[in-house]
Amino acid sequence: MKLGVILPTFRDTVDDALEVARRCEEQGLDGVFAYDHLWPMGSPTRPSFAPFPVLAAAAARCPSLHVGPLVARVGMVGPAHLIDQFRSLASIAPGRVVAALGTGDVKSRDELEGYGLAVTSADQRRSEMELIARALRDDMPVWIGAGAEATNELARQLDVTLNVWDLDADRLTALTALGPVTWAGPVRENLPGLLDELRNAGVQWAVLAPGVDVAALAHWRDRGGC
């Protein structure tokens, strides 16, 4: 199981994010990721860095790390633009980009409307996500954020990876029986126990939210966790 960390991008500067990326590479972790939010959920006055520039900077500084948004939300920009963003990032980090995609949900509405963006239907967003995934899947790993059953089924039809947020071990095991799954979620008090559960459920990646102890992740790996 590969280990990744979501960078802290709800900040006034990118310094913290790049420092976390440096520590991840120093500890031999596998990748870093970044949220794709116009502002932190429910906090429109707080800063939020766009994921692709931060990931490009991290990739240029840390050549061993995989990088990707978690997840790039379909519908905020046109499909062709989003495809170009992934390909531009891949030109900086060839072979190291994860194209993680999501359709968003009702919680995304305030952000989109706050920036004057249209809120399209879930069916339209899924259609655009399929177009993007088909365009990229031969060049880089594609993850689709789990959600509605129609979205989960699309991931299986496309033979790409399903990415889940903070799902428990029992439901994970059921999903991994159907196809590849990656997990992302918040840090828990018993980090080694969480990682053991994810590994035993057959998860391919565990990606921890900002604030995780990077050294503790490396320690779990070094004692044979992966």
Regions found by a protein language model. Give the residues of each.
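Active-site-adjacent structural elements that line small-molecule/cofactor binding pockets in enzymes
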Residues: 1-226
